[in-house]
Amino acid sequence: SSTETPPSYNQLNYNENLLRFFNSKPVTAPVELDPPKVESSYVSSARGEDARSTLSPVQGFEGSGGSGSSGNFTTGSNLHMSSVTNTSNAGTGTSGTGNSGDGGGGGGADGPGSGAAPPVTLTESLLNKHNDEMEKFMLKKHRESRGRSGEKNKKSANDAMKMLEYSGPGPGHGHGIKRGGSHSWEGEANKPKQQLTLNTGGGGGGMPPFLDIQHTSSSTQNKGLAGVGVGGAGGGVVGVGSSAGGNGSGTGNNNGNGNNNQPTTNQFTQSGLSCTQNINLWPPFSVGITTPTSVLSSHTAVAQSSFSPQHSLFPTFYYIPASIAASSPSGTSPNPNRPHKHAHVHSSSEKPSTSQAAAATMPLQYMTGVMYPHPSLFYTHPAAAAATAMV
């Protein structure tokens, strides 16, 4: 901005000059500053010719002679003295005496001047002084406006640079957030994203959401699901357990009134594990809590007459024939019209788990022709495992 030529005073003051001129309601110039009298006499002579057509030749000649002075008068004060102008024109046409026109013009011109305040005499030095002062003022205002706009541009550029620095690639930037549960197959302890569920008491056949907690042990032979029992027509969630190849008894009770009495959040303190009742939101491969092989965790399998179907990411259904159902742990069902949620014990044929013996004592039964939901695609169904073991 220092190298460019500053604008002139007329350029800076152009709009203000226009506004000031039209707001002042400008008056016409006095008689001394009129345009040349040739135009005024030409206009007035044209008017005289119009009037002469209706008069005698002598009157018309006199009218045209008097129209010269009246023409000067009309152009001089046509704004302030419009009424006088009309009357003088009429008088010029009829009487043809220019003296009456001159008299009216003189009176009209003196009237506004005497009534107004005496104007200040404008000399050349006064005008130059005013122009110098106004030029300094306008240049100062121009510099301030340019400075403000320059500061705004500079600030916006700095903000843009800061935004680029914050969002640009760097340590911790430009990469996805590292998610827990992405290394469950590497045997590390992970924290999958889970949603904490509240205890729901089912009154009148309420079905609380089924809780599925999976545990991946470090030995591939002992993979298990935590069996979650759900209360009957008046009950809620009963018990939660983990399976890592051990035996034990589950905790939890079911009141017939629909009250849901559960143990505290720490379900596995007896086996050295701390786990909360959560719903896994990730696929089964990324979900897992690694349990040490030295810890024997209890497997709880408590099933009631009804259950809420599990909504897994990959729903898979299996048809259980009657022959395999006969080989499964049998028992009497209180309500044969409803399917059962069974505790799935995943164990290899070489090392049967003691949890199967515990599950055999439970009143569980595979119904013939009933579709049983399976938690995921990555585990073998216990009925299929039993069939292969028998073969």
UniProtKB/Swiss-Prot annotation:
Summarize the PTM comment. Answer: Phosphorylated with a circadian rhythmicity, probably by the double-time protein (dbt). Phosphorylation could be implicated in the stability of per monomer and in the formation of heterodimer per-tim.
PANTHER family xref list:
PERIOD CIRCADIAN PROTEIN (PTHR11269:SF16)
Q: What is the effect of changing residue 243 to G?
A: In strain: FA
- Gene name, per UniProt, is per
What InterPro entries has UniProt attached to this entry?
Answer: Period_circadian_regulator
Q: Which UniProt keywords are present, listed alphabetically?
A: Biological rhythms, Cytoplasm, Nucleus, Phosphoprotein, Repeat
Subunit structure, per the record? Forms a heterodimer with timeless (TIM); the complex then translocates into the nucleus.
Instruction: Report if keyword Nucleotidyltransferase is assigned.
Output: no
Spell out the Gly residues composition-biased ranges.
Answer: 93-114, 241-255
User: What does this protein do, in the record's words?
Assistant: Essential for biological clock functions. Determines the period length of circadian and ultradian rhythms; an increase in PER dosage leads to shortened circadian rhythms and a decrease leads to lengthened circadian rhythms. Essential for the circadian rhythmicity of locomotor activity, eclosion behavior, and for the rhythmic component of the male courtship song that originates in the thoracic nervous system. The biological cycle depends on the rhythmic formation and nuclear localization of the TIM-PER complex. Light induces the degradation of TIM, which promotes elimination of PER.
Annotated GO molecular function terms are: transcription cis-regulatory region binding; transcription corepressor binding
Q: Where in the cell is it found?
A: Nucleus; Cytoplasm, Perinuclear region
- Any one Gene Ontology BP term: negative regulation of transcription by RNA polymerase II
Q: Name the chain's protein.
A: Period circadian protein
Superkingdom, taxonomy of origin: Eukaryota
The region called Disordered is annotated at 27-121, 163-188, 241-270, 328-357
Assigned GO CC terms: nucleus; perinuclear region of cytoplasm
